[in-house]
C-alpha cells in the first residue's frame, strides 16, 4: 500500500539545502536561478544528440542494414523513449534534486543503487563527450580538405576543441544556450533545405511512402536499425540536470523533454525518408554501398547546390561542437551535485561568482578530456575507429542502462507514496518503458560488433565497463555508509526537505 512521503528520522528539514548553502558561499555562489526556459533546455538536449552529424554520419549505415524501411526504426525508437518520458517527467515533479538519473534511482531503488547510477552516469557522459573529440577531429579534417585542401593532424584539432569547449562551458548557462540555439538552427536548417529541394523536385523516382509498408519494415536488419536509432537520441534525458537553473521547473522540464523526444523522432525519420527519396527506393542501397559517408553531401549537391554541400561540411563541425558543449555542461552539473552531496571533492562544487557556472568541475572535466585525447594520440590510435567508438560504446550503453533503471525506479517510487499522477504515468508506462529500454540495450549489445568494428575481446571489455562502474559505485556507497554516515544518510536529498528514500 502507498504511504505518505515523510521526513526521514534524524534528518532535519532543509538538510540538503543547508549542505548546498555551505558550498554556495560568497566566494562560490549558487547556479543562476530561473534563467532557462523551455526552448533553452530543449536546445541543450537536442544539441547533445547532434542531428546533422547523426544524419550525415550514421543514418547511411542504418539504411545500409535496414534498407528502405529505415525511417520506421527512428519512429519506433522515438515512441519508446516518449513512453519512457511519461514516467520520467512525472517523477521530475516529485523529485526536486538536480542530480538527474542518480537522484531518481536513489528515490526509487535506494542509496546503493543511486551511488552505482552516479558512477555509471559519470562514465557514460564522459565517455560520450570525450569520444566525440575524435569525431570533431575527423569532421574538421574532412571539412578543411574538402573546402581548402588543408590537412591538419587530428590531435591538434581535438586538443583545440577541448579548450574551445572549456571556454564555452566556463561562461554563463544563458551564453551557452544562445550559442547552442544558433548552432542548432544552422544544422537543422541545412537539412530542411535538402528536404525542400527533394520535395519540390519530386525525388529521383517520385515521392513514395514504401518506407512505411510492412514488407520494407519487417526485415532482418530492423534490429540493427533500432540499435542505431536509439543511439541517436542520446542526451535527451539530461533535461532534469538543469532543474535548478530552469524557470518554473515543474512545467519547463517535462515540456522540454517531450519537445526534444518528439522533435528528434519525427525529424530523424523525415530526414532519412528524404534522402531515400533523393536517390529513389530502387537505387538507395547502391548509393549507400558506393559512398555511405557522402550520401547526404551528394544529395545536397544535386538538389540544392554545391554551396549547400560546402555549408554542410562546416555545419557538421559546429553540430559536433554543440553536442560536446551540451555533454560538457551536463557532466559539470553532475560533478557539482555530487560534490555538494559530499561524494566528490568539495572544490568541484564551486560556482563562478560572475558567470554562475560550475567552473571547477568544468576545468576537471576538460583536464580529463585532454588526458584521454593525448593518450590516444600518443598511442597512435585512430580518432574515429578508436577514440570515438571505444569511448562512445560504454557511454551509450551506460545511458541506456540508466534509462532502464530509472523506469523501474519510477514504478517503485510511486508505489511508496500517495499521489494523483494516475496508473498510466506511474505503473503502465514506466514498466513498459523498462522492458523496452532493456530490449533496446540488448539490441545495441548484440549488434556491438557492427557498430564498433572491433574484435570480440575489445567489445566485451567496452560493454563490461558499465556493470563494473555500477558495482564500483555500490561498493563506494557501502564504504561511505561506514565512514561518513551523514553523507550517506543525506545522499540525493531534496533541496528543501529530507524526503524518505528507499533503502
What are these regions (language model features)?
Residues 394-402, 424-503:
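A generic transmembrane alpha-helix motif of multi-pass inner-membrane proteins
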Residues 103-104, 110, 142-146, 262-327, ...:
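TM-loop-TM module centered on a large, flexible mid-protein loop between adjacent transmembrane helices
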Residues 97, 120-135, 238-245, 306-346, ...:
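Membrane-helix boundary/coupling elements in multi-pass transport proteins
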Residues 1-59, 63-69, 82, 206-213, ...:
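Membrane-interface "cap" regions at the ends of multi-pass membrane proteins
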Residues 154-201, 256-265, 398-401, 416-435, ...:
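Membrane-interface loop-to-helix entry segments
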Residues 23-142, 239, 446-453, 461-464:
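Transmembrane helix-boundary motif of multi-pass solute transporters/channels
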Residues 103-107, 134-154, 185, 243-249, ...:
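Helix-loop-helix connectors at the membrane interface of multi-pass transporters/channels
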Amino acid at each position: 500500500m502507498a504511504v505518505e512521503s515523510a521526513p526521514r528520522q534524524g534528518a532535519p528539514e532543509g538538510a540538503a539545502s543547508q549542505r548546498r548553502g555551505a558550498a554556495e558561499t560568497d566566494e562560490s555562489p549558487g547556479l543562476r536561478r530561473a534563467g532557462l526556459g523551455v526552448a533553452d533546455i530543449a536546445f541543450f538536449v537536442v544539441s547533445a544528440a547532434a542531428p546533422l552529424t547523426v544524419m550525415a554520419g550514421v543514418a547511411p549505415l542504418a539504411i545500409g542494414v535496414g534498407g528502405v524501411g529505415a525511417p520506421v526504426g527512428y519512429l519506433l525508437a522515438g515512441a519508446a523513449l516518449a513512453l519512457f518520458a511519461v514516467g520520467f517527467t512525472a517523477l521530475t515533479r516529485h523529485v526536486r534534486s538536480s542530480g538527474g538519473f542518480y537522484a531518481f534511482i536513489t528515490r526509487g531503488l535506494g542509496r546503493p543503487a543511486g551511488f552505482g547510477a552516479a558512477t555509471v552516469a559519470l562514465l557514460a557522459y564522459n565517455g560520450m563527450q570525450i569520444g566525440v573529440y575524435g569525431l570533431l577531429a575527423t569532421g574538421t579534417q574532412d571539412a578543411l580538405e574538402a573546402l581548402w585542401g588543408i590537412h591538419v593532424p587530428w590531435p591538434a584539432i581535438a586538443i583545440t576543441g577541448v579548450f574551445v569547449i572549456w571556454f564555452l562551458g566556463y561562461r554563463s548557462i544563458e551564453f551557452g544556450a544562445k550559442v547552442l540555439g544558433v548552432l542548432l538552427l544552422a544544422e537543422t536548417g541545412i537539412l530542411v533545405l535538402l528536404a525542400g529541394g527533394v520535395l519540390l523536385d519530386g525525388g529521383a523516382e517520385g515521392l513514395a511512402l514504401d518506407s512505411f509498408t510492412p514488407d520494407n519494415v519487417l526485415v532482418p536488419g530492423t534490429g540493427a536499425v533500432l540499435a542505431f536509432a536509439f543511439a541517436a537520441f542520446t542526451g535527451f534525458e539530461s533535461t532534469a540536470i538543469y532543474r535548478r537553473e530552469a524557470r518554473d521547473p515543474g512545467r519547463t522540464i517535462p515540456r522540454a523533454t517531450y519537445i526534444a523526444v518528439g522533435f528528434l523522432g519525427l525529424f530523424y525519420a523525415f530526414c532519412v525518408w528524404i534522402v531515400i527519396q533523393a536517390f529513389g527506393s530502387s537505387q538507395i542501397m547502391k548509393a549507400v554501398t558506393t559512398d555511405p559517408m557522402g550520401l547526404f553531401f551528394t544529395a545536397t549537391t544535386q538538389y540544392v547546390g554545391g554551396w549547400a554541400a560546402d555549408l554542410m561540411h562546416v555545419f557538421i563541425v559546429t553540430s559536433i561542437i554543440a553536442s560536446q558543449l551540451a555533454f560538457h555542461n551536463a557532466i559539470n552539473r553532475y560533478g557539482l551535485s555530487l560534490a555538494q552531496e559530499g561524494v566528490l571533492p568539495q572544490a568541484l562544487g564551486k560556482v563562478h561568482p560572475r558567470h554562475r557556472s560550475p567552473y571547477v568541475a568544468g576545468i576537471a572535466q576538460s583536464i580529463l578530456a585532454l588526458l584521454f585525447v593525448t593518450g590516444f594520440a600518443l598511442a597512435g590510435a585512430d580518432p574515429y575507429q578508436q577514440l570515438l567508438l571505444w569511448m562512445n560504446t560504454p557511454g551509450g550503453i551506460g545511458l541506456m542502462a540508466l534509462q532502464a533503471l530509472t523506469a523501474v525506479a519510477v514504478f517503485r517510487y510511486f508505489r511508496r507514496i500517495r499521489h494523483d499522477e494516475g496508473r498510466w504515468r506511474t505503473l503502465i508506462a514506466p514498466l513498459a518503458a523498462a522492458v523496452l529500454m532493456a530490449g533496446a540495450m540488448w539490441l545495441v549489445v548484440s549488434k556491438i560488433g557492427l557498430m564498433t568494428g572491433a574484435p570480440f575481446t575489445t567489445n566485451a571489455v567496452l560493454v563490461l565497463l558499465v556493470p563494473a562502474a555500477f558495482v564500483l559505485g555500490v561498493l563506494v556507497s557501502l564504504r561511505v555508509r561506514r565512514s561518513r554516515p551523514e553523507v550517506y544518510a543525506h545522499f540525493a536529498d531534496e533541496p528543501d526537505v529530507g524526503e524518505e528514500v528507499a533503502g
